[in-house]
Regions:
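Short, helix-capping/interhelical loops that line the mouth of catalytic, cofactor-
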Residues: 1-8, 52-130, 159-183
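Membrane-proximal, proline-rich intrinsically disordered regions
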Residues: 27-28
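Short acidic/glycine-enriched loop/turn segments that link adjacent beta-strands
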Residues: 40-42, 125
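Short alpha-helical transmembrane interface motifs in multi-pass membrane proteins
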Residues: 134-136
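Alpha-helical transition-metal enzyme core signature, strongest for iron centers
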Residues: 13-20, 43-58, 88, 95-105, ...
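Surface-exposed patches in mature extracellular/periplasmic domains of secreted proteins
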Residues: 32-35
Length: 183
């Protein structure tokens, strides 16, 4: 019995995507070109990278249903994604892309069987481990998004914005302190 299945995977992904969209909404469009360092993605580029980041696992697991990665044209696929990331977009277009791509991926996750999630996929020769379950591989997009969302939260701080999750935590602590003081 699996206690964390497709519905939980989809719900967790939706939560992560909702928080990413909130960050995108809170950063003013004039700061979408901000880069923490010259050799990093801008805020806007990072948000688009996150938005289209689900296309790789979708191709592997939902379109091709690959059992092995050998023979997959990773560089060809990556070049298409990279071109997509470079297309100019407004803040609203980026937020819409995040929403649409995120919901499409979450819906695909939601309907997966436990059997499908348990299937092993052989990775590229020489990789360690040599294979992973689809479940582990499909956790990857959420982990990838959280990695880049942390970068966006640092950018928010550099731009003078307190991230919404930090504000929410501060509000909870303040409420607990106020309640403790009344006792």
């Amino acid at each position: 019995m699996n206690y964390y299945g497709s519905k939980e995977l989809a719900a967790a992904f939706r939560t992560v995507r909702k928080n990413t969209i909130t960050i995108g909404e809170e950063i003013p469009e004039e700061h979408y070109g901000y880069r923490a360092t010259p050799d990093t993605r801008s805020v806007g580029e990072t948000l688009v990278h996150i938005a289209v980041g689900t296309r790789f696992p979708a191709q592997i697991h939902f379109v091709e249903r690959r059992g092995a990665m050998a023979g997959f044209d990773f560089m060809g696929f990556l070049s298409k994604i990279t071109a997509e990331e470079k297309a100019p977009r407004s803040k609203n277009e980026i937020l819409q892309l995040l929403h649409v791509e995120g919901e499409k991926f979450a819906q695909a996750l939601e309907g997966l069987s436990e059997e499908f999630l348990g299937e092993r996929v052989d990775l590229m020769p020489g990789m360690t481990p040599p294979a992973k379950s689809r479940f582990e591989m499909l956790l990857g997009p959420k982990e990838h998004e959280m990695h880049h969302r942390a970068q966006l939260m640092v950018a928010e701080r550099a731009l003078g914005i307190t991230p919404h999750l930090t504000r929410q935590m501060q509000e909870r602590f303040a409420a607990m302190q106020a309640a403790a003081g009344k006792g």
